[in-house]
Amino acid sequence: MDPSQNPNIVHATTIISVRRGGHVAVAGDGQVTLGHTVMKGNARKVRRLGREGQVLAGFAGAAADAFTLFELFEAKLDKHGQLTRAAVELAKDWRTERRLGKLEALLAVADKETSLIISGTGDVIEPEDGIIAIGSGGAYALSAARALLAHTELDAKTIATEAINIAGDICIYTNRNVVVEEL
């Protein structure tokens, strides 16, 4: 749903995951918007998951729904111990459990080897170029990250941070208060 169509939904963020040089970084902005009002500027939408923090995850969408998905995904990760298997098992549940079908959120998850998007329809998508960008500023961040990867020697963490900053300059639902995690 377009954020402007329902002013009562908490929405809009930008999350990006970038791989370079054997490292992966996931970054997100800190803005939470309700309707046309910024409610919070320093939300933490990127977290480490798993027993040893071996998976990075970021969310876009309704905050309460995203926290529910974080919890469910982490339970699957603890049970299966492997990112792809946990994502597929969560996606199966998302498609079959009635309460999950109504959740309005996307997850971007990454470990040392794999990056995945878990979509609101229960799809699990692996990007072909190792970059994930979701949320209202996702297209801007994706474009910035691709350009920085192609034309600089910057590391994954710096590219992810700069991509969020560029998106924050363009997208009104994204700010420059960046939280970034790296493996």
Curated annotation (Swiss-Prot):
GO terms for molecular function: metal ion binding; threonine-type endopeptidase activity. It catalyses: ATP-dependent cleavage of peptide bonds with broad specificity. Keywords: Allosteric enzyme, Cytoplasm, Hydrolase, Metal-binding, Protease, Sodium, Threonine protease. PROSITE patterns: PROTEASOME_BETA_2 (PS51476). GO terms for cellular component: HslUV protease complex; proteasome core complex. It is found in: Cytoplasm. The keyword Hydrolase applies. Allosterically activated by HslU binding. The active site is at T13. The keyword NADP does not apply. Coiled coil: none annotated. Its EC number is 3.4.25.2. Pfam families: Proteasome (PF00227). SUPFAM superfamilies: N-terminal nucleophile aminohydrolases (Ntn hydrolases). Na(+) binds at G168, C171, T174. One of its GO terms (biological process) is proteolysis involved in protein catabolic process. A double ring-shaped homohexamer of HslV is capped on each side by a ring-shaped HslU homohexamer. The assembly of the HslU/HslV complex is dependent on binding of ATP. Protease subunit of a proteasome-like degradation complex believed to be a general protein degrading machinery. NCBIfam families: ATP_dep_HslV (TIGR03692), PRK05456.1 (NF003964). Belongs to the peptidase T1B family. HslV subfamily. This is ATP-dependent protease subunit HslV. It comes from Xanthomonas oryzae pv. oryzae (strain MAFF 311018).
